[in-house]
């Protein structure tokens, strides 16, 4: 079951983001010092700010527990940015990420978007393959001097 997040649930959502992004941070050697903007280290104030500015946030539940989270941010008339797609390690490989992704495409399309963009750690080949297998197209890369990895940019059409 996927549904919109309420403000009171943001601390629970942050725990999901921290745990899910934490496995990737560990794998790629990310720390609060070398990558403070990574979801593994995000403060509640940032998530609350995004919520209050109107970003759409959703959770995927199994029973009473939150298994996954995602955030959609409008970036233009026809474009949304998919952010913080996160599935707790114990719920991975059960289709929750794919369900959240499909829901994101439908939600963005219902709000007039034609495309969804995402930025990932380019060196995370497993994640990149997953997005490509789920309809995304690799659009290029960029090196940012403040990040210890290359950012890969992907995009997909909404609604499908």
PLM regions and their residue ranges:
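Acetyl-CoA-dependent GNAT
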Residues: 4-89, 98-103, 107, 140-146, ...
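C-terminal "cap" of GNAT-fold acetyltransferases
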Residues: 114-134, 141-160
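A generic secondary-structure micro-motif detector
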Residues: 36-37, 94, 117
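Conserved glycine-rich acetyl-CoA-binding loop
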Residues: 65, 88-102, 109-111, 122-129, ...
């Amino acid at each position: 079951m996927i549904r919109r997040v309420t403000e009171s649930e943001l601390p629970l959502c942050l725990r999901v983001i921290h745990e899910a992004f934490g496995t990737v941070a560990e794998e790629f050697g990310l720390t609060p010092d070398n990558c403070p903007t990574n979801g593994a280290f995000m403060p509640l104030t940032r998530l609350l700010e995004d919520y209050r500015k109107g970003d759409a946030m959703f959770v995927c539940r199994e029973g009473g527990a939150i298994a996954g989270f995602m955030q959609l941010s409008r970036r233009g008339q026809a474009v949304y940015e998919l952010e913080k797609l996160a599935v707790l390690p114990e719920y991975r490989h059960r289709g929750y990420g794919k369900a959240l992704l499909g829901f994101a495409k439908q939600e963005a399309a219902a709000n007039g978007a034609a495309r969804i963009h995402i930025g990932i750690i380019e060196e995370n080949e497993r994640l990149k393959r997953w997005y490509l297998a789920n309809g995304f197209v690799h659009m290029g890369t960029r090196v940012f001097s403040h990040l210890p990895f290359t950012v890969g940019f992907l995009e997909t059409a909404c609604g499908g």
